């Protein structure tokens, strides 16, 4: 794993992630509160290796709120999770040095200012897509996915290459993303490296 300071990396990732999704963030609870406003949750706290006291404070804030998530990057206290319900277990923050790439055949990129969407179509249907945003010298990659019927064809890798092609053209030299267990294998094959583990929880539903 990389050994760069996690608070700074999280701030850099959040900056780009919020840009890709058109959402806002604010400092809160020794971390960040992002107003996600998605079907899955309304808001999400992000903490880096919190102390037991810091975690307990956030648990109290989300008590009874299944629509508010808590994501912890790095170490996690063993105590203090009783007020939370697990959402994900085995995700990672990942990072890479971006390199100039040729836009793969069949990949279309649609960009506006600091944002881009890469799309792969098969017979007129969207088979795979992904998006990215550039903030400073960072490119944050997000929502990389392939439709079930088109998996195992290398399309996600081409989407990543198309996004990298665009990001480098915008002056980015570092890539950041949050990877699921499934996605991590793809990113590792493309040269991405793990930075730190992350786990996500939600507040328990009221009884």
Q: Where do the PLM segments sit?
A:
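Conserved acetyl-CoA-binding loop-helix of GNAT-fold acetyltransferases
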Residues: 55-59, 146, 152-165, 169, ...
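A short, internal acetyl-CoA/4′-phosphopantetheine-binding micro-motif in the GNAT/acyltransferase core
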Residues: 46-51, 144-151
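Conserved hydrophobic beta-strand within the GNAT/NAT acetyltransferase core sheet
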Residues: 141, 174-179
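N-terminal charged segments
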Residues: 1-69, 73-79
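Conserved active-site alpha-helix within GNAT-family acetyltransferase domains
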Residues: 76-85, 157, 169, 181-198, ...
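Acyltransferase donor/substrate-recognition loop-hinge adjacent to the catalytic core
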Residues: 83-117, 122
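A conserved beta-strand-loop-helix scaffold within acyl/acetyltransferase catalytic domains
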Residues: 110-148
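C-terminal "cap" of GNAT-fold acetyltransferases
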Residues: 89-100, 178-181, 200-207
